């Protein structure tokens, strides 16, 4: 289950990158910092394309999968827990003589 979600996560990440790069630019650097605000406020409302909507959905799915992958452990227990259990089982199996 974990590896299937991880594979899906990587595929969505690649498709999200591609869909982001395929989108049309909305201006140069000045527009990113508010330089093109007059055009966006007074101009015709921007029509969201299918690519824009797909990018939104892919981004949301990417975030949900990231949260799922952080919650779902790929194995039960951690390395530290396994080493503690191993040490405890070895300690029970051997008898220690009292220090004489």
UniProtKB/Swiss-Prot annotation:
Region (Disordered) residue spans: 77-100
Single Gene Ontology MF annotation: protein-transporting ATPase activity
The keyword Metal-binding appears for this protein: no
Highest rank taxon of the organism: Bacteria
Membrane spanning residue stretches: 8-32, 49-70
Cytoplasmic compartment segments: 33-48
GO cellular component: plasma membrane
Keyword terms of this UniProt record: Cell membrane, Membrane, Protein transport, Translocation, Transmembrane, Transmembrane helix, Transport
Biased composition (Polar residues): 83-100
Topological domain ranges for the Periplasmic compartment: 1-7, 71-100
InterPro entries, per the entry: SecG
Membrane topology according to the record: Multi-pass membrane protein
Name of one Pfam family that matches: SecG
Entry's Gene Ontology BP terms: intracellular protein transmembrane transport; protein secretion; protein transport by the Sec complex
Location relative to the cell: Cell membrane
Protein transport in keyword set: yes
Quaternary structure and partners: Component of the Sec protein translocase complex. Heterotrimer consisting of SecY, SecE and SecG subunits. The heterotrimers can form oligomers, although 1 heterotrimer is thought to be able to translocate proteins. Interacts with SecDF, and other proteins may be involved. The channel interacts with SecA via subunit SecY.
Described purpose of this protein according to its UniProt entry: Subunit of the protein translocation channel SecYEG.
Record-stated family: Belongs to the SecG family.
Name of protein: Protein-export membrane protein SecG
Source species of the chain: Aquifex aeolicus (strain VF5)
Gene that specifies this protein: secG
